[in-house]
Amino acid sequence: WFGCDDFDDDLVDAIKAWQKKSGIKADGLCGPGTHRRIFTERQSKIDDYEPDLIKDKDESFIVHHGNFIPINWPKVVLWSEVKGYKARKGYTSYYEPRDIKMFVNHWDVCLNSRSCHRVLEKRGLAVHFLIDNDGTIYQLLDTNHAAYHAGSKKHNHSSIGVEISNAYYPKYQDWYKKNDFGERPIISGETVHGAPMKDFTGFYDVQLEALKALWSAVHEG
């Protein structure tokens, strides 16, 4: 796309150069944002969704720098397991431990982790972890590899990417209730850079607890 293989700074610069050359002054959503919203809208109207119903485990592990690290969370599925999701593209492999400086936690704007994984595959992107509506943590690849999720090469190569399932818009509340996840909290009165935001759906408590367990496991590992 625009002569670039990855969705990173080089692609953004290429798009800006094309816009300038073409005399385009109004910017628009650059691919993934538009794709996610259209995909989520379509998925909400399909009636064949069935949750994966992941069972609790007595012991759970994630893979961090090539090692199995225990995590204090009952619902964890690795890419090598049945019902697991694997990143097939959208990352750079490393054989020496990466210097990881941060987590980048994404609001996936999808109805569930299965849909998020499909969008990532479609866009040639990847993250290390998905957190589903019921708090299930899916690991897509070893944290030792750099996933393409944060836009810039600098941030991709120094971070762990997590997509947390939440379709964001209150109009999807009926979908969550229909599929037995329950209503999401509605967040009101927030501002970003001084600009007021419209109401949006918050995360389930179980998702936030799963995220904290993941942070803790990586920190201790």
Regions found by a protein language model. Give the residues of each.
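Cell-envelope/ECM-targeting effectors and their regulatory/trafficking segments
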Residues: W1-V82
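Active-site-adjacent loop/helix surface patches within enzyme catalytic domains
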Residues: P70-E220
